[in-house]
């Protein structure tokens, strides 16, 4: 399956090797490292090396060219054990990336609008098609949204006159114009499940913000910093769908982002039980204060379906890939309460946790401070430099002050202290429409692109 390079002379200017399919480069004889390479005829790659050395890899006319170039790079892209993982540089060290044409399904809703803001100047993704319901089809995007634009930042003029197509009946038109789609549709679950599979079977990869496929066994539900290894299930999903390119990958529920990333680095201490109460912003319901007046001076102690998602989804995220499926973890035991509160953006979580091996407070803080995920190692465009941030102040984190930490992509924590019933308790906060929705989906798409799943 693989051709092999045993070694190469680090002092040489260039080496060329004919390749077929994938390529395994084993450079350990020179004390450099090892890594995978995926064949391409259109763009250069960088093969990440362990010993602070960059090797630029370019494929042209079925030739692999390896250059031993300068060592003045700050990051490397290869992560051992995770297959094909790339960041892209030219021989001068400038980051480059193939441009992908993307569609947004559900572009007129609040999350869809957030996608449009995030993708305006994205370095990799170019929006070429907007899709929504038949009510919006045939209208310009500006006409379809009307007075329901939910943000203070105005709609970008380059999207205003784009004509919206029907997400269900114009699928073939979408397939001709995009490399993959984001999906943020408000639709009955069984219909949405069928819609996303139909797109995948049209050979259009789907990055979904929706819940319809979160518990489909061969569909990865990914928080990019936490369980990128679940992407390994995609080939099995393609086999089931009988596709070559098409697949579905989903992000988890917005409520999870305020506590699961904070619990994840603590798994090494053996988490036994978790109790969490989430205080969720109205934008999570697609509402503003104008469209949800009943929330003013009020707290609503029920959000349909949220508690079940908050208790079950983490177990899939912490599960294992076995025989082409993701088998959910059986622990920890999680119990959740979810409340709607009069906050525009930002989900807060009060978290209580019991451990098999109780750590010290210093060990927990150290685990948070030192944790970095694959998006940080790959320097993905939407990845925050500091994924988890702890506030020492007693009155932090606060939604109004801290939801935009890391451009809304960081998860913040505070008030870590021992508890009289559980071992520890703390407060977590995440931005529900950035990290928790569109931003998390864009980051997932960046991860998929960097790993070659859209090739």
Listing of model-derived features with the role each one plays in the protein:
Residues 283-455:
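Charged docking surfaces used in two-component/phosphorelay signaling
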Residues 13-15:
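Intrinsic low-complexity, disordered N-terminal segments enriched in polar/charged/small residues
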């Amino acid at each position: 399956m693989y051709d092999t390079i045993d070694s190469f002379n680090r002092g040489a200017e260039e080496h060329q090797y004919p390749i077929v399919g994938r390529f395994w480069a084993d450079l350990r004889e020179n004390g450099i490292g090892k890594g995978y390479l995926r064949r391409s005829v259109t763009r250069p790659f960088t093969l990440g090396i362990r010993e602070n050395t960059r090797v630029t890899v370019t494929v042209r006319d079925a030739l692999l060219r390896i250059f031993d170039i300068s060592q003045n790079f700050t990051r490397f892209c290869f992560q051992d054990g995770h297959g094909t993982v790339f960041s892209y540089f030219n021989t001068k060290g400038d980051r480059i990336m193939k441009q992908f044409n993307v569609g947004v399904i559900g572009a007129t809703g609040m999350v869809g609008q957030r996608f449009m803001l995030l993708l305006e100047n994205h370095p990799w993704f170019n929006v070429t098609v907007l899709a929504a319901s038949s009510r919006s089809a045939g209208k310009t995007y500006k006409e379809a949204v009307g007075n329901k634009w939910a943000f203070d930042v105005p709609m970008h003029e380059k999207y205003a006159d784009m004509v919206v197509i029907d997400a269900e009946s114009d699928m073939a038109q979408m397939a001709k114009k995009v490399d993959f789609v984001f999906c943020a549709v408000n639709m009955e679950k069984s219909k949405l499940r069928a819609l996303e599979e139909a797109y995948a079977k049209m050979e259009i990869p789907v990055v979904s913000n929706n819940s319809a496929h979160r518990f489909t066994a061969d569909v990865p539900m990914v928080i990019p910093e936490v369980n990128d290894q679940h992407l390994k299930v995609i080939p099995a999903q393609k086999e089931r769908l009988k596709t070559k390119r098409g697949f579905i990958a989903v992000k988890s529920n917005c409520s999870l982002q305020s506590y699961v990333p904070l619990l994840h680095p603590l798994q090494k201490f053996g988490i036994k039980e978790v109790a969490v109460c989430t205080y969720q912003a109205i934008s999570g319901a697609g509402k503003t204060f104008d469209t949800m007046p009943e929330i003013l001076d009020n707290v609503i102690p029920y959000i349909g379906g949220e508690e079940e998602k908050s208790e079950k989804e983490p177990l899939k995220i912490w599960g294992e890939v076995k025989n082409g499926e993701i088998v959910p973890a059986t622990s920890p035991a999680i119990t959740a309460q979810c409340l709607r509160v009069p906050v525009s953006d930002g989900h807060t979580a009060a978290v209580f946790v019991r451990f098999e091996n109780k750590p010290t407070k210093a060990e927990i803080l150290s685990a948070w401070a030192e944790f970095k995920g694959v998006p940080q190692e790959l320097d993905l465009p939407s990845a925050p430099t500091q994924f988890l941030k702890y506030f020492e102040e007693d009155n932090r984190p606060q939604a109004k002050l801290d939801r935009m930490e890391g451009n809304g992509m960081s998860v913040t924590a505070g008030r870590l202290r021992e508890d009289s019933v559980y071992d520890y308790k703390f407060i977590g906060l995440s931005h529900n429409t950035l990290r928790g929705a569109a931003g998390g989906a864009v980051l997932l798409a960046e991860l998929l692109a960097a790993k070659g799943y859209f090739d």
